Amino acid sequence: MAAAAAVVTPSGLEDEVSRSRGEGAGEMVVERGPGAAYHMFVVMEDLVEKLKLLRYEENLLRKNNLKPPSRHYFALPTNPGEQFYMFCTLAAWLINKAGRPFEQPQEYDDPNAIISNILSELRSFGRTADFPPSKLKSGYGEHVCYVLDCLAEEALKYIGFTWKRPAYPVEELEEETVAEDDAELTLNKVDEEFVEEETDNEENFIDLNVLKAQTYRLDMNESAKQEDILESTTDAAEWSLEVERVLPQLKVTIRTDNKDWRIHVDQMHQHKSGIESALKETKGFLDRLHNEISRTLEKIGSREKYINNQLEHLVQEYRAAQAQLSEARERYQQGNGGVTERTRILSEVTEELEKVKQEMEEKGSSMTDGAPLVKIKQSLTKLKQETVQMDIRIGVVEHTLLQSKLKEKSNMTRDMHATIIPESAIGSY
């Protein structure tokens, strides 16, 4: 996999992120190289490979119906809201994959709380996060790539994944084999294979000088033995077939290898001579520059000593004035502290005085105002009227009660007389 060939270690990422910003006020910021601006693209590509190793397409994207991010999704600004939501979703999923319980963020959650929780989980893994949380609100940038890459590393560690060294394919050389044929080995077995092993490049080369010597020796032996006139008894058709069979095996191919140092020897010598010639001229310029710098430094040193000697009394006066200034500042700080305390006491006394004045004004206004007396008189008049009305009602009720009693008494007397008269009449009969 491509991620195995270009692995960015977490410590390297942390150093890169820490070098990209100052650690505090007054601290020197380390300048980065010209390629540091493109470092987050490399980190983002490694992050995509690690997410593929974690099978995020099946376990995250399809379940949440999300679109797979591009190889530079978090490195370039496209849609901040969508990128921030994707960042929070990926971070929560990676934290869960790393063995830590983490709730999946929702759209209505507070972004600051989500970022704070993610950074606290990142620090719990032992990773550094010394950048402001506002860097993650945009949803893109090197800090977003750094956080996701660290969480992906922790998730891979938790599942037991380890990076292996890349295995480069070995180029196999085509071995040219020559089939042995006992019918053709008539003279001293001239078709022997001579192979010379080269320990530098681990490849086999055929020694052409040996083949040439063998051919020359074969010709000499044949010329010595064949003194009489030879008569050919070979069939032309069989000879053609044999030539066609042996011809591919007689081809000697020597392949050039770019790794062989012999090809670059001439170029190395040319570069060496060029460097030596340039070094002679450059060395003279550098020697002259060194001498000039040395003389200038000596002049600067002597001038500095002269200035120090001339301004020594002024430096002493300056130090004395500096000491007096520090004492005056200290007295000023003490006096300023006393003034502040007295100002606070004055404000408290003024506040109490305002309260007393307000109370006095309220009491004076209540004493001089005649409105309460008028209200009391009106209430008394109203009470008298209500008393008169009540007396009248009581008299009416008493009169009505007396009339009812008299009427009841008269009715009772009439009833009594009515009952007595009939009894006397009955007695006369």
Swiss-Prot record:
It holds the Pfam family IFT57. The keyword Transcription applies. Residues 1-26 are annotated as: Disordered. GO terms for cellular component: ciliary basal body; ciliary base; cilium; Golgi apparatus; intraciliary transport particle B; microtubule organizing center; photoreceptor connecting cilium. One of its GO terms (biological process) is apoptotic process. One of its GO terms (molecular function) is DNA binding. Its main location: other. It comes from the Eukaryota. Residues 305-369 form a coiled coil. The keyword DNA-binding applies. It is found in: Cell projection, Cilium; Cytoplasm, Cytoskeleton, Cilium basal body. The pseudo DED region (pDED) mediates the interaction with HIP1. Belongs to the IFT57 family. Component of the IFT complex B, at least composed of IFT20, IFT22, IFT25, IFT27, IFT46, IFT52, TRAF3IP1/IFT54, IFT57, IFT74, IFT80, IFT81, and IFT88. Interacts with IFT20. Interacts with IFT88. Interacts with IFT80, IFT-81, IFT74, IFT172, IFT70B and KIF17. Interacts with BLOC1S2. Interacts with RYBP. Interacts with HOMER1; the interaction possibly prevents the pro-apoptotic effects of IFT57. Interacts with HIP1. In normal conditions, it poorly interacts with HIP1, HIP1 being strongly associated with HTT. This is Intraflagellar transport protein 57 homolog. The gene is IFT57.
